[in-house]
Protein backbone atom coordinates (compact mmCIF):
# COMPACT_ATOMS: atom_id res chain seq x y z
CA UNK A 1 0.00 0.00 0.00
CA UNK A 2 0.98 3.64 -0.21
CA UNK A 3 2.13 3.92 3.40
CA UNK A 4 4.41 0.88 2.97
CA UNK A 5 5.80 2.42 -0.22
CA UNK A 6 6.68 5.55 1.75
CA UNK A 7 8.46 3.53 4.42
CA UNK A 8 10.59 1.68 1.88
CA UNK A 9 11.42 4.94 0.12
CA UNK A 10 12.54 6.46 3.40
CA UNK A 11 14.85 3.59 4.18
CA UNK A 12 16.21 3.34 0.63
CA UNK A 13 14.66 -0.05 -0.07
CA UNK A 14 13.62 0.58 -3.66
CA UNK A 15 13.21 -3.17 -4.26
CA UNK A 16 10.60 -3.46 -1.49
CA UNK A 17 12.73 -6.06 0.32
CA UNK A 18 13.09 -6.54 4.08
CA UNK A 19 14.14 -3.54 6.14
CA UNK A 20 17.33 -3.59 8.24
CA UNK A 21 16.76 -4.44 11.91
CA UNK A 22 17.66 -0.93 13.10
CA UNK A 23 15.08 0.57 10.79
CA UNK A 24 12.50 -2.04 11.75
CA UNK A 25 12.84 -0.88 15.36
CA UNK A 26 12.20 2.72 14.34
CA UNK A 27 9.16 1.64 12.35
CA UNK A 28 7.84 -0.43 15.28
CA UNK A 29 8.22 2.57 17.58
CA UNK A 30 6.40 4.79 15.09
CA UNK A 31 3.63 2.20 14.82
CA UNK A 32 3.22 2.26 18.60
CA UNK A 33 2.97 6.05 18.52
CA UNK A 34 0.46 5.91 15.67
CA UNK A 35 -1.67 3.39 17.56
CA UNK A 36 -1.60 5.55 20.68
CA UNK A 37 -2.55 8.66 18.71
CA UNK A 38 -5.40 6.87 16.93
CA UNK A 39 -6.79 5.72 20.28
CA UNK A 40 -7.67 9.37 20.93
CA UNK A 41 -11.34 9.69 19.97
CA UNK A 42 -10.89 13.34 19.00
CA UNK A 43 -8.18 12.42 16.49
CA UNK A 44 -10.38 9.71 15.01
CA UNK A 45 -13.38 12.05 14.88
CA UNK A 46 -11.43 14.59 12.85
CA UNK A 47 -9.93 11.97 10.55
CA UNK A 48 -13.42 10.65 9.83
CA UNK A 49 -14.51 14.22 9.07
CA UNK A 50 -11.65 14.55 6.60
CA UNK A 51 -12.35 11.18 4.95
CA UNK A 52 -16.04 11.96 4.54
CA UNK A 53 -15.06 15.18 2.76
CA UNK A 54 -12.17 14.07 0.55
CA UNK A 55 -10.43 10.69 0.25
CA UNK A 56 -7.12 12.08 -1.04
CA UNK A 57 -6.78 14.48 1.90
CA UNK A 58 -7.47 11.60 4.29
CA UNK A 59 -4.87 9.23 2.82
CA UNK A 60 -2.39 12.09 2.48
CA UNK A 61 -2.87 12.93 6.17
CA UNK A 62 -2.24 9.32 7.22
CA UNK A 63 0.88 9.09 5.04
CA UNK A 64 2.21 12.37 6.40
CA UNK A 65 1.57 11.19 9.96
CA UNK A 66 3.67 8.07 9.43
CA UNK A 67 6.39 9.94 7.57
CA UNK A 68 6.56 12.74 10.14
CA UNK A 69 6.82 10.15 12.91
CA UNK A 70 9.76 8.48 11.18
CA UNK A 71 11.53 11.81 10.64
CA UNK A 72 10.86 12.71 14.27
CA UNK A 73 12.43 9.44 15.39
CA UNK A 74 15.43 10.10 13.15
CA UNK A 75 15.73 13.57 14.70
CA UNK A 76 15.77 11.88 18.14
CA UNK A 77 12.73 13.73 19.44
CA UNK A 78 11.30 12.44 22.72
CA UNK A 79 8.22 10.22 22.75
CA UNK A 80 5.77 12.93 23.87
CA UNK A 81 6.94 15.33 21.16
CA UNK A 82 6.64 12.63 18.50
CA UNK A 83 3.09 11.89 19.66
CA UNK A 84 2.22 15.58 19.30
CA UNK A 85 3.91 15.67 15.89
CA UNK A 86 2.01 12.63 14.59
CA UNK A 87 -1.25 14.00 15.98
CA UNK A 88 -0.70 17.33 14.22
CA UNK A 89 0.27 15.53 11.01
CA UNK A 90 -2.95 13.50 11.01
CA UNK A 91 -4.92 16.72 11.55
CA UNK A 92 -2.87 19.20 9.53
CA UNK A 93 -5.37 19.54 6.67
CA UNK A 94 -8.57 19.47 8.76
CA UNK A 95 -9.16 23.11 7.76
CA UNK A 96 -9.76 21.97 4.18
CA UNK A 97 -13.24 20.78 5.15
CA UNK A 98 -14.17 24.48 5.06
CA UNK A 99 -12.81 24.94 1.52
CA UNK A 100 -15.14 24.39 -1.45
CA UNK A 101 -14.66 20.86 -2.80
CA UNK A 102 -14.39 22.29 -6.33
CA UNK A 103 -11.21 24.05 -5.23
CA UNK A 104 -9.88 20.93 -3.50
CA UNK A 105 -10.47 18.84 -6.66
CA UNK A 106 -9.53 21.47 -9.25
CA UNK A 107 -7.78 19.59 -12.14
CA UNK A 108 -5.50 22.56 -12.78
CA UNK A 109 -3.48 25.15 -10.97
CA UNK A 110 -5.63 27.41 -8.81
CA UNK A 111 -6.33 30.97 -9.84
CA UNK A 112 -5.39 33.82 -7.51
CA UNK A 113 -8.75 33.95 -5.73
CA UNK A 114 -8.84 30.17 -5.23
CA UNK A 115 -5.26 30.10 -4.02
CA UNK A 116 -5.95 32.81 -1.44
CA UNK A 117 -8.92 30.79 -0.18
CA UNK A 118 -6.86 27.59 -0.03
CA UNK A 119 -4.18 29.41 1.95
CA UNK A 120 -6.71 29.93 4.73
CA UNK A 121 -6.87 26.23 5.63
CA UNK A 122 -4.07 26.23 8.26
CA UNK A 123 -5.78 29.04 10.18
CA UNK A 124 -9.22 27.45 9.76
CA UNK A 125 -7.89 24.14 11.06
CA UNK A 126 -6.16 25.81 14.00
CA UNK A 127 -9.33 27.67 14.97
CA UNK A 128 -11.43 24.50 14.73
CA UNK A 129 -9.07 22.56 16.99
CA UNK A 130 -8.67 25.46 19.45
CA UNK A 131 -12.40 26.04 19.87
CA UNK A 132 -13.75 22.50 19.84
CA UNK A 133 -11.07 20.12 21.14
CA UNK A 134 -8.52 19.84 23.92
CA UNK A 135 -5.33 19.05 22.05
CA UNK A 136 -2.06 20.48 23.41
CA UNK A 137 -1.29 23.96 22.12
CA UNK A 138 1.82 22.52 20.45
CA UNK A 139 -0.43 20.32 18.28
CA UNK A 140 -2.69 23.19 17.28
CA UNK A 141 0.24 25.48 16.57
CA UNK A 142 1.97 22.84 14.44
CA UNK A 143 -1.21 22.60 12.36
CA UNK A 144 -1.22 26.40 12.03
CA UNK A 145 2.44 26.58 10.98
CA UNK A 146 2.74 23.69 8.53
CA UNK A 147 2.89 26.00 5.48
CA UNK A 148 5.38 28.43 7.00
CA UNK A 149 8.84 28.57 5.41
CA UNK A 150 12.14 28.45 7.25
CA UNK A 151 13.05 31.87 5.76
CA UNK A 152 9.76 33.43 6.88
CA UNK A 153 8.17 33.68 3.43
CA UNK A 154 5.42 31.11 4.03
CA UNK A 155 1.92 31.57 5.40
CA UNK A 156 -0.23 32.43 7.30
CA UNK A 157 1.95 34.45 9.72
CA UNK A 158 5.31 34.70 7.91
CA UNK A 159 7.23 33.18 10.80
CA UNK A 160 10.59 31.53 10.23
CA UNK A 161 13.58 29.83 11.80
CA UNK A 162 13.36 29.17 15.51
CA UNK A 163 10.16 31.22 15.74
CA UNK A 164 8.53 28.09 14.30
CA UNK A 165 8.07 24.96 16.38
CA UNK A 166 10.49 22.22 15.36
CA UNK A 167 7.47 19.94 14.87
CA UNK A 168 6.07 22.47 12.37
CA UNK A 169 9.32 22.32 10.41
CA UNK A 170 9.25 18.51 10.36
CA UNK A 171 5.61 18.50 9.28
CA UNK A 172 6.35 20.99 6.50
CA UNK A 173 8.94 18.65 4.98
CA UNK A 174 6.82 15.50 5.36
CA UNK A 175 3.81 17.26 3.84
CA UNK A 176 5.71 18.41 0.76
CA UNK A 177 7.38 15.02 0.29
CA UNK A 178 4.10 13.10 0.25
CA UNK A 179 2.26 15.69 -1.85
CA UNK A 180 4.94 15.68 -4.54
CA UNK A 181 5.34 11.89 -4.67
CA UNK A 182 1.55 11.44 -4.99
CA UNK A 183 -0.50 11.60 -8.19
CA UNK A 184 -2.59 14.75 -8.34
CA UNK A 185 -5.07 16.03 -10.95
CA UNK A 186 -2.60 18.74 -12.01
CA UNK A 187 0.66 16.74 -11.94
CA UNK A 188 1.90 13.14 -12.08
CA UNK A 189 3.81 11.75 -9.09
CA UNK A 190 7.42 12.86 -8.99
CA UNK A 191 10.16 10.32 -8.30
CA UNK A 192 11.48 10.31 -4.71
CA UNK A 193 14.88 11.31 -6.08
CA UNK A 194 13.32 14.34 -7.80
CA UNK A 195 11.48 15.36 -4.64
CA UNK A 196 14.59 15.05 -2.49
CA UNK A 197 16.51 17.11 -5.03
CA UNK A 198 13.80 19.78 -4.73
CA UNK A 199 13.86 19.69 -0.91
CA UNK A 200 17.66 19.78 -0.71
CA UNK A 201 17.74 22.65 -3.21
CA UNK A 202 15.46 24.67 -0.93
CA UNK A 203 17.28 23.94 2.32
CA UNK A 204 17.55 27.11 4.36
CA UNK A 205 14.77 28.74 2.36
CA UNK A 206 11.63 26.62 2.52
CA UNK A 207 13.01 23.88 4.77
CA UNK A 208 15.04 23.64 7.98
CA UNK A 209 18.59 22.54 6.99
CA UNK A 210 18.82 20.17 9.99
CA UNK A 211 15.69 18.32 8.86
CA UNK A 212 16.84 18.25 5.24
CA UNK A 213 20.10 16.68 6.42
CA UNK A 214 18.22 13.93 8.28
CA UNK A 215 15.98 13.26 5.28
CA UNK A 216 18.84 13.23 2.78
CA UNK A 217 20.68 10.62 4.85
CA UNK A 218 17.61 8.41 5.13
CA UNK A 219 15.35 8.77 2.13
CA UNK A 220 15.59 7.16 -1.25
CA UNK A 221 17.47 9.62 -3.47
CA UNK A 222 18.15 7.08 -6.19
CA UNK A 223 15.97 5.99 -9.13
CA UNK A 224 13.53 3.14 -8.56
CA UNK A 225 15.24 -0.18 -9.25
CA UNK A 226 18.69 1.00 -8.16
CA UNK A 227 20.14 -1.05 -5.31
CA UNK A 228 21.79 0.92 -2.53
CA UNK A 229 24.22 -0.56 -0.04
CA UNK A 230 23.44 0.65 3.47
CA UNK A 231 26.41 1.82 5.50
CA UNK A 232 26.96 0.25 8.93
Feature-to-residue mapping (PLM):
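Histidine- and acidic-residue-rich, metal-dependent catalytic cores
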Residues: 3-232
Amino acid sequence: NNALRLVHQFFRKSDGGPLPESEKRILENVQQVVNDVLSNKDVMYNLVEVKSYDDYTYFHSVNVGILAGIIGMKCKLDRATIEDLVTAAFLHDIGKIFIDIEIIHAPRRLNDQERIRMMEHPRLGYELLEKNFRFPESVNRTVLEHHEWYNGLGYPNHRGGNDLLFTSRVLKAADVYDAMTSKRPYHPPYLPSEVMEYIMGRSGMEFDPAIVEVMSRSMCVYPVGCEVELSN
